[in-house]
Amino acid sequence: MFSGNQGAEIDGGMVENLNKTMENHRKTLLHLLKERAYKNGKFTLSSGKESEHYINCKPVTLSCEGNALCSHLMIVHVEDNSVAVGGLTLGADPLVCGIAQKAYYSGKHIDALIVRKNPKGYGTKEVIEGNKPPKGSIVTVLEDVTTTGSSAIKAVNVLRESGYIVNRVVAIVDRQEDHKIWDANKIEFISLFKLEDIVKCEI
């Protein structure tokens, strides 16, 4: 039989191992982002701004390892009681699908929603694709890279206008351009990494 102290030691050991695992996943994902997603040069961003730093997460989020790591690290930041995750196509597509699968194998129910940039031009003319939950449900928005936050906020607005509650946006990378947009739209913003984390990462 275990004593109370032994039980506490086991619990503490499990937490320590879990923390180490999460940190190892973070390091691996950071290295993948630096190796596959980051470029240095002269670029025009989707916001129209010029930058010497460019990040395209798709070679990471659409890879088996990268998608699994993103799902593992992002699901812990999905708002409690969220029944779905959603985001603007195309950057958020692999993220919402990865989270939905991760949730299923973790005994949770979180569906994936894809927000179109424009309504479908035929049929039901949907702007939100997926197994849509009842109105009033909580949905967390996911994004790969945020610069001004406009893409994520577009998804937030579409979901809110469709009757869903959106309080949080979770991104892989925050370029740290402007955070005023989050407060203005009453959004809690969380990112796994800052741009400087990737720039400084050595591989």
Listing of model-derived features with the role each one plays in the protein:
Residues 17-32, 156-203:
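PRPP-dependent phosphoribosyltransferase catalytic core
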Residues 95-140, 150-153:
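Short, glycine/charge-rich flexible loops or terminal/linker lids adjacent to PRPP-binding catalytic cores
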Residues 47, 130-134, 161-162, 182:
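Solvent-exposed alpha-helices and their adjacent loops that cap or buttress functional pockets
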Residues 15-80:
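Active-site-facing substrate-recognition patch
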Residues 1-20:
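N-terminal amphipathic/basic-hydrophobic helices that include classical n-h-c signal peptides
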Residues 79-83, 134-136:
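Short helix-loop-beta connector
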Residues 82-91:
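Short glycine-rich phosphate-binding loop at a beta-alpha junction
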